[in-house]
Amino acid sequence: MARRFATRVTVSGTTFVRELDGILEYRLNTNGLQILLTQDPNAPVAGFMVTYHVGSRNEAIGYTGATHLLEHLMFKGSKNFNKENKKTIWEILETKGALVNATTWNDRTNYFEVMPKEHLGTAITLEADRMRHAHIREEDRQSEMTVVRNEFERGENNPMEALDKQIWALAYEAHPYHHSTIGWRSDIEKVPIARLKQFYDDFYWPDNATVSIVGGFDVKEALAMIVKEFGKHSKKKGDYLAMYTEEPNQEGERRATVARAGNTDLVGIAHKVPAAVHSDIPALIILALILADGKTSRLYRTLVDSALAIDVSTNCYQFHDPSLLITYATLASRTPHQKIEELVKDAYRAIALKGVSSTELNRAKRSIRTYIASLRDGPYAFLSALNEQIAAGDWTRFVTFPKKLVQVSAKDVQRVARQYLIDDQSTVGWFKALPQI
Amino acid sequence: MKKQTYGAQAFSIVEGGKLLVAPTSAKDVVAVEGSVLGGSNHLPKRWDVIPSLSAELLDAGTNKKKKGVIRGALADRGISLSFSAGGDRTFFSGQCLPEDLPFLLSTIAECLGGAHFPEAEVKAAKARALGSIAELKTDTNMQARIALSRILYDTAHPNFSRTLEEEETSIRSSTRRNLLDFRHKFCRDGLVLAVTGDVNAGTVRKAAEKAFGKLPAKGFAPLAKQLNKKPSASAEKLIPIPDKANVDVLLGAALPLHKSDPLFYPAYLLAEMLGGGFASHLMMTIRERDGLTYGVYATLRGFDGATDGYLRIWATFSPEKYTESVAALRKEVRTFFSTSITEKALLKKKEEITGSYLVGLSTARGLARILHQFTIDGRDLAFLAEYPDYIRAVSLAHVRAAAKLVPLHKLSFAASGTFPKI
């Protein structure tokens, strides 16, 4: 994906919006569908992704997990692609070698195909069809509910996932980041099909979606195909339901414990951070890398090199709304939770008080440069990364964000550590292994 | 017509090593995949933890450089590097910017040739390994996998797993000397190195020759072929673990087959038709039709180097539907073998695999992995282009011959989780 060719063309029915670093943006005139194209004419493979601007942040009590369950039902067939006419997505795309799947997260839902390029037209036609003509049926909900419930159960088998759910649920009491994308078990089991259909009709429209194509394809042909297939749909009549709930200010540290039979002990420490587009996020990303990226990071050396923990990670989430910076440590046998919690907080305080070295700053920037280069290695990595920026609210961050990371100074890192890593804004979780009976 | 080899070139390097280089259009991305001979199958069973402890500590200090110097220099350049251990080989995987490739290759070679495993690092690695073992004791998937391997294989076979308690004993008694003795046998004979991405073949070759030429000429040797001595039996093993929301279920059978056997690819297609991808028989029935699982998969496993492997069917089930689900799984496996191995199903699967092969080659990392894997399987560079033809050439008769290797009425069974009270 090195040489991206910005071959801007004019295709009736579309409006060219802009070009940025080889990514062409268009709009479909009739319904407002956003289109992002990045061409590599010599590539034998193309990737196609539809990103709907709806995720679990658009759910509420009673239908948590609805976005994800609906994502599953979207594979049950649509008007022109279904079991009855033997044209399921598996039959017409997976059996041609396409990587076919979908993912749901807090702020978005995506559907994608990465395939030999001659099948791109099929993917466009199918995705356009299920955008407005998906079969959302009770008989499919019944069989798919148990599939999703088993996905939930798999997650519950994992101590880290169980603790993570508790930390988010405690850190957010009002905002829907409170619940995980997969939802609460009882909602998965009981959400009525009418609610899922309503969810589909509320959010699955062209003016609430972005289609992206990366790899080997002809820009003019692809745009014409998009006009033909997605142009069949009108834009939504009426406004989209706004998610207006804001998380109230946190007034003091919060603590959670998950105690289950087993041998795994974990500590998780979360702090509130601003939304992805906020100007402090680049410094927070660098801070997270200095804390726990690689074997030279502060927490790895303190916790893992010393064998107090088996592993450690720090992640600064970049979501549409304010979210969390979280450190997780898996404890070695006999290490007390309290000790790990204190050492992590000591590491935070050290940066807040004394800052970081130029060596640490440069390593973090070099690491992220390598990582960002890898995001353009192949259609799926590219689409996936672009999709997260779409979800955060501004796809151009895919191009501009790396430049902002380069500009982060040691003082910026110290400032954000002081501003955000404060106990009053923290949520601490312990997973405690209970003796097996 | 000229066959597509994706711009890859193969070189013999450092007397016994093989280098594969494939420049791609990826900018600023260099992917490295490689390995040297030396894995758990080269050691007595009781020492099978040594290769993984060694792999963890290869970058923790060498005869010339301390841990902090090695790791710091890699971090200064934004290089990621990891080592891991397998049955016959010790693997390395890295990523760097183009200008740092010579440094990455020289660091890999220095670690392989000079790691000296300081006592304090060995002690810490053992403590971490014991912690990981403790975690695995309540991992339902791992427990079922260990149980199945013990049912299928004789105790001397490489695919026979020891218990986690036995592993703990081995970790505790491992010494720095064990690690040094193992590492001293890494050599350039059998080295395989694949480098792809934003690279130039001439530059890579020069850097690889310089770096790996310092490894000893001889050491670990390829292992002789093995065959399982344990007869098939429809044995069952349940491993209860409290407080688990999901049960991991495995069905399997040892196959009298090696990777170099003509029936290997037919057996691979058979497994893929049974449980590879959403369109496979088991996913279409157990998940799509019955809604009993999030995932059910059939794969060929345990075909490391010269080892005869096995067919493994893995599914996850809800405890409350456990009995019904296991019965459905067994029934659908039988149905597949009796009615679903058809010309039409085979044609579809062949088209899927040849298409997905192309998709897999579309990243520098994917291309490096495939180049490395084909080479350690004993294939030459031409196989990169010929692989789709190999798949297309598999006939229904071949697949049915492979199916006869599966002792359908003697499939073994292992499951772990919180079981319903019956």
Residue ranges of predicted features:
Chain A
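M16 family metallopeptidases and their MPP-like homologs
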Residues: 38, 43-59, 65-69, 84-130, ...
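Generic structural signal for individual residues within well-ordered alpha-helical segments
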Residues: 121, 142, 189, 197, ...
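His/Glu-rich zincin catalytic helix
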Residues: 1-88, 112-115, 125-127, 198-305, ...
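Histidine-acidic residue clusters that define the catalytic metal-binding segment
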Residues: 5-26, 169-209, 241-247, 284, ...
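Short, glycine/charge-rich beta-strand/loop segments that flank catalytic centers
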Residues: 104-112, 139-150
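Short, polar/flexible loop-turn hinges at active-site or ligand-entry regions and domain interfaces
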Residues: 76-83, 131-139, 356
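Short, conserved secondary-structure transition motifs
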Residues: 149-155, 245-260, 366-375
